[in-house]
């Protein structure tokens, strides 16, 4: 993309999944109007408000370098919210679009992460990044290769340029490794009303904006990844009494402990904590 930054296309919720997926392949991002019904959003907010208020600002783990000290990142929504489990996680259009993007190349998809993201007054702009960068495989993708993730950010408050609306570079998912680094003047803000959502590919450059107001900016983020990013065999059915006779390395190899990527990014967590800590998992010494 060159010259003036392109606007983000806004689409009605009656859009067909195939049309939406085609727009994502072309632009890397779309805004979906009326993604969440007002009553769903209100019930979700009521369930998480108290926990969000109790959540401290800043990163819970050192790998979360994109979470600054004026941002709240509250994960573990499966545990915290029945509305998220029942009405949001299984959003039909979101999953139908993901099927269009992933199924032919990968098969099923699953939840990568979910969190409430709240920018406090004075929160600085986030560094521009691609969500797929947490996966080493992203280094080997060409712009025309299958995508590695599909992110969704729902506005729970109004998103304005002044309060830190997410900024994105439409078309940047088509940039190869030789392309110059992205710059803020290439971005456009995702201006949204509560209940609207941005969907964007993991290969698209984006970042949270600066909150220059006295109000918070709250969003609900979640991302889907292909099922290829999981072991062929599950070991969750193995009795815990057996697992706790194993060494920490053996437990990690069968999926009972958090693992780390090439950038020490934690995968397979329990909310914002290491899985073994949440479980209180015992082990035998090596």
Curated annotation (Swiss-Prot):
GO terms for biological process: terpenoid biosynthetic process. GO terms for molecular function: dioxygenase activity; metal ion binding. InterPro entries: Phytyl_CoA_dOase-like (IPR008775). The keyword Nucleotide-binding does not apply. Disulfide bonds: none annotated. Pathway: Secondary metabolite biosynthesis; terpenoid biosynthesis. Disruption phenotype: Impairs the synthesis of both terretonin and terretonin C. Gene3D superfamilies: q2cbj1_9rhob like domain. It comes from the Eukaryota. SUPFAM superfamilies: Clavaminate synthase-like (SSF51197). It holds the Pfam family PhyH. Its EC number is 1.14.11.-. Its cofactor is Fe cation. Keywords: Dioxygenase, Iron, Metal-binding, Oxidoreductase. Fe cation binds at residues 129, 131, 206. Belongs to the PhyH family. Homodimer. Dioxygenase; part of the gene cluster that mediates the biosynthesis of terretonin, a fungal meroterpenoid that acts as a mycotoxin. The first step of the pathway is the synthesis of 3,5-dimethylorsellinic acid (DMOA) by the polyketide synthase trt4. DMOA is then prenylated into farnesyl-DMOA by the polyprenyl transferase trt2. Methylation by the methyltransferase trt5 then leads to farnesyl-DMOA methyl ester which is further subject to epoxidation by the FAD-dependent monooxygenase trt8 to yield epoxyfarnesyl-DMOA methyl ester. This is Dioxygenase trt7. The lineage of its organism: Eukaryota, Fungi, Dikarya, Ascomycota, Pezizomycotina. The gene is trt7.
């Amino acid at each position: 993309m060159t010259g003036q930054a392109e606007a983000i296309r806004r689409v009605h919720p009656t859009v067909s999944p195939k049309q939406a997926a085609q727009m994502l392949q072309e632009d890397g991002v779309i805004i979906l109007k009326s993604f969440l019904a007002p009553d769903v959003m209100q019930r979700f907010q009521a369930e998480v408000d108290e926990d969000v208020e109790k959540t401290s600002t800043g990163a819970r783990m050192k790998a979360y370098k994109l979470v600054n000290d004026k941002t709240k990142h509250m994960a573990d929504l499966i545990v915290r919210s029945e509305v998220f489990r029942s009405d949001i996680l299984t959003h039909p259009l979101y999953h139908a679009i993901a099927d269009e993007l992933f199924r032919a190349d990968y098969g099923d998809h699953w939840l990568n992460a979910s969190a409430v993201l709240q920018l406090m007054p004075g929160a600085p702009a986030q560094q521009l990044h691609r969500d797929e960068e947490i996966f080493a495989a992203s280094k080997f993708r060409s712009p025309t290769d299958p995508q590695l993730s599909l992110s969704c950010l729902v506005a729970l408050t109004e998103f304005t340029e002044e309060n830190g609306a997410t900024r994105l570079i439409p078309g940047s998912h088509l940039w190869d490794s030789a392309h110059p680094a992205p710059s803020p003047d290439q971005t456009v803000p995702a201006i949204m009303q509560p209940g609207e959502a941005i969907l964007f590919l993991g290969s698209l450059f984006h970042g949270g904006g600066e909150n220059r107001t006295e109000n918070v900016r709250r969003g609900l983020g979640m991302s889907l990844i292909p099922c290829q990013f999981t072991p062929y065999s599950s070991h969750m059915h193995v009795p815990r009494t057996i697992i706790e006779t194993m060494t920490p390395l053996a437990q990690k190899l069968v999926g009972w402990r958090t693992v780390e990527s090439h950038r020490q990014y934690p995968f397979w967590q329990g909310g914002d904590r290491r899985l073994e800590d949440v479980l209180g998992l015992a082990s035998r010494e090596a």
